[in-house]
Amino acid sequence: MSNDVKIGRQFLIDEFGVRSETIERFEHYHSLVLKWQPAQNLVSRETLAHFWVRHICDSSTLIKLNGPKGIWLDFGSGAGFPGLVTAILHKQLNADGPSSVVHLVESNKRKVAFLRTVIRETGINAVVHASRIEKFVENSDIKPDFISARAVTALKNLQVFSEDYVSKGSACFFHKGRDINGEIAEAANIFDFDLVKHIQALPGNRQSDGVIAEIGTIRRKTS
């Protein structure tokens, strides 16, 4: 077992009290990433060796902020961060059902197939929507409690996708880089919004690459 796996497993046990079956789901998720990686390039080569800390632990921060509850909408899910991690933790921490589900929006057909494989083989409560984000937003009647995104697009674009949901009570939690101030300034040309930056701390004395931007209100500016 690599040091990354040991640190990641212990973090999940310490922070969430996860049981063996949840660890096994994460292990199976990891094995599927390794299996699909050569053809799909699901994660960068630089972070693959630190999968548990850089991706699983990093994504789990959302549960620490909000608890295992509610309907989640994850934009541009890619390899499943943070959406699949959220759903795997929900499986144990909250009896998953209609009130606790993660909706993953992804347009890449191969990544859609990967996400559906993980969901099927781990038995988690998540749904994949094979769509571009803008098309999904136009046509969906889902009413999420929380919206997430990680390494997808600029903050201003995420706010465009999210503004109608937020007006109905949704809260946004976007993983962004530590250089987020430039994106905030750019978004402020279009929207008035309330934003809280949560600094992420990763286990094993690793420095996180970013912050989580929590947004509770989005109001489009009028000229």
List PLM regions with ranges.
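A short glycine-rich, Lys/Arg-flanked "PGG" loop and its adjoining helix->strand segment in the class I
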Residues: 159-171
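Conserved hydrophobic residues forming the short capping helix/wall of the S-adenosyl-L-methionine
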Residues: 37, 90, 119, 188-191
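Residue-level signal for inorganic ion chemistry
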Residues: 33, 86, 176
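Conserved SAM/SAH cofactor-binding pocket of Class I
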Residues: 60-149, 159
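Active-site capping/gating segments
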Residues: 103, 177-223
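Short glycine-rich anion-binding loops that position phosphate/pyrophosphate groups of nucleotides
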Residues: 78, 151-154, 178
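Class I SAM-dependent transferase core
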Residues: 1-69, 110-125
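Conserved beta-strand segments of alpha/beta enzyme cores
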Residues: 101, 125-127, 171, 192-195
